[in-house]
């Protein structure tokens, strides 16, 4: 009987055979580039598009959720679409396919660039002096910039698709491409420019 121990089985995976997860099983997320350092920590990209609301009761934890899921959640925030997560997810997936076909780029990268471009840097608040409301320009926090960018993208999608012949996924793709290219005709960019113009006048 041999006293030598049997050779252990080879490991299931090695450093040379890493499996990279993909969003929706299609889109790589490992090489996403960020141009705006101020919003970098608030734009999270993960392969998970549905976290089951685990951060819903924790303040500011929304920044740890994938930016794709946050866009999906934004699309549900109307009377008709409330709670229809599968439908909103399907819209985003189909919009991503359209974006990839038209731009030859990773649609996740297009979304990140669109959010960076659509977030206003300044806005106005109203201060009361002796009963008189006076507008005052203030800087926008990076987390709020991301929130407003997603809001503008969702609003632009509704405006383009509600009571029109344009499919909603087509409208969303149009908003993402326009914002990523900083097209002033795109709703998210025009809203950002308008807020910054009003803020500049209130300095």
Curated annotation (Swiss-Prot):
InterPro entries: Ribosomal_uS7, Ribosomal_uS7_arc, Ribosomal_uS7_CS, Ribosomal_uS7_dom, Ribosomal_uS7_dom_sf, Ribosomal_uS7_euk/arc. GO terms for molecular function: rRNA binding; structural constituent of ribosome. One of its GO terms (biological process) is translation. GO terms for cellular component: small ribosomal subunit. CDD domains: uS7_Eukaryote. Disulfide bonds: none annotated. Keywords: Ribonucleoprotein, Ribosomal protein, RNA-binding, rRNA-binding. Residues 1-21 are annotated as: Disordered. It comes from the Archaea. The keyword Nucleus does not apply. The keyword Protease does not apply. It holds the Pfam family Ribosomal_S7. Coiled coil: none annotated. SUPFAM superfamilies: Ribosomal protein S7. Part of the 30S ribosomal subunit. Belongs to the universal ribosomal protein uS7 family. One of the primary rRNA binding proteins, it binds directly to 16S rRNA where it nucleates assembly of the head domain of the 30S subunit. Is located at the subunit interface close to the decoding center. This is Small ribosomal subunit protein uS7. The gene is rps7.
């Amino acid at each position: 009987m041999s006293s030598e121990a049997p050779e252990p089985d080879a490991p299931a995976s090695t450093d040379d055979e890493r499996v990279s997860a993909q969003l929706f099983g299609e889109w790589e997320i490992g090489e996403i580039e960020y141009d705006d350092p101020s919003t970098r920590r608030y734009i999270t990209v993960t392969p998970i598009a549905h976290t089951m609301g685990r951060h819903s009761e924790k303040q500011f934890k929304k920044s740890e959720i994938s930016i794709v899921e946050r866009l999906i959640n934004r699309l549900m925030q109307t009377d008709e679409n409330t709670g229809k997560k599968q439908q909103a997810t399907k819209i985003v997936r189909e919009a991503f396919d359209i974006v990839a076909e038209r731009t030859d780029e990773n649609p996740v990268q297009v979304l990140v660039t669109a959010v960076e471009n659509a977030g206003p840097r300044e806005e106005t608040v109203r201060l009361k002096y002796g009963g008189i409301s006076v507008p005052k320009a203030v800087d926008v926090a990076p987390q709020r910039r991301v929130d407003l960018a997603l809001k503008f993208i969702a609003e632009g999608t509704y405006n383009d698709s509600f009571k029109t012949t344009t499919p909603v996924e087509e409208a969303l793709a149009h908003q993402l491409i326009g914002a990523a290219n900083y097209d002033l005709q795109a709703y998210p960019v025009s809203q950002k420019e308008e807020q910054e113009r009003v803020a500049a006048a209130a300095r």
